[in-house]
């Protein structure tokens, strides 16, 4: 059999093989069979080398023509198979829009976010403006401008996270006070929500991160009675009931006098584990803004006065909803969180 006859037989065999191709894999296998390194046309290349010189051009042209024919047919077949497989894939992914849909699960506010918003909303109703400051703060804004002495324990690394010798993670939202008083002249009435950080052991009552709201008011003739009236009104609205407040003298560098605020426990003095059988629950620290803080902001303490108060949001949430462990707020336990969403 001559090479020409062999090429014709290859064409016929190729046509038979092509009729059995139904997928991309079948097509790939067929291509390897005829055009691969060990395929049928490899044998023709070997035969061509043994042909007489005067016949090589003619026979070589015939081999190339047959090979080109097979390549063109394979290309056409690949386009047909690709279109077919894409259509099949489309049908697999097709969505029946007539079927009833499935409701996506809805999220809800985290309890801390909910309580934080409730607290801020109450102060906004009282005429306060919302202001924020960065979590990463200079030691100056976090301590110095708020009348913290250089050797105050709060400045030490065992209590505060230092990023470098003069930069800290803020320990309170009072850094808003130092910024706002330096930027705005009285009257100033601001509520400042945010996240705070302290180097403490994590327990049922404390955490290294917590949320705080600070509120402060500076104007002429602001008095201690304005502070107590504000506190009384706030807690009455927040807890939805009349609560008795108790004020205890305390020390905070940025206020003078300073007080700690307690509210009456729901046990009404009978004593329970929540109030440690005292009948009272600590809820805030407050006081009249220290004259040194006003002077640092170039505000004359002889002309202006003001009060400041700060409260922990986790503490308020625990009291309002009867939660005994602060760690529950950050453990992402949906069984706990869904009770409040």
From Swiss-Prot:
E.C. number: 6.1.1.20
Binding-site list for Mg(2+): 256
CDD domains in the cross-refs: PheRS_alpha_core
Gene Ontology biological-process annotations: phenylalanyl-tRNA aminoacylation
One Pfam entry name: Phe_tRNA-synt_N
MF (Gene Ontology): ATP binding; magnesium ion binding; phenylalanine-tRNA ligase activity; tRNA binding
The entry's keywords: Aminoacyl-tRNA synthetase, ATP-binding, Cytoplasm, Ligase, Magnesium, Metal-binding, Nucleotide-binding, Protein biosynthesis
Manner of cofactor binding, per the entry note: Binds 2 magnesium ions per tetramer.
SUPFAM superfamilies: Class II aaRS and biotin synthetases (SSF55681), tRNA-binding arm (SSF46589)
Cofactor annotation: Mg(2+)
Keyword Cell inner membrane: no
Subcellular location: Cytoplasm
Catalytic activity: tRNA(Phe) + L-phenylalanine + ATP = L-phenylalanyl-tRNA(Phe) + AMP + diphosphate + H(+)
GO CC field: cytoplasm
Entry annotated with the keyword Transmembrane helix: no
Cited InterPro entries: aa-tRNA-synth_II (IPR006195), aa-tRNA-synth_II/BPL/LPL (IPR045864), Phe-tRNA-synth_IIc_asu (IPR004529), Phe-tRNA_ligase_II_N (IPR004188), Phe_tRNA_ligase_alpha1_bac (IPR022911), Phenylalanyl-tRNA_Synthase (IPR002319), tRNA-bd_arm (IPR010978)
Chief localisation class: cytoplasm
NCBIfam families xref list: pheS
Family: Belongs to the class-II aminoacyl-tRNA synthetase family. Phe-tRNA synthetase alpha subunit type 1 subfamily.
Quaternary data: Tetramer of two alpha and two beta subunits.
Classification via HAMAP family: Phe_tRNA_synth_alpha1
Protein name (record): Phenylalanine--tRNA ligase alpha subunit
Organism ancestry: Bacteria, Pseudomonadati, Chlamydiota, Chlamydiia, Chlamydiales
Gene: pheS
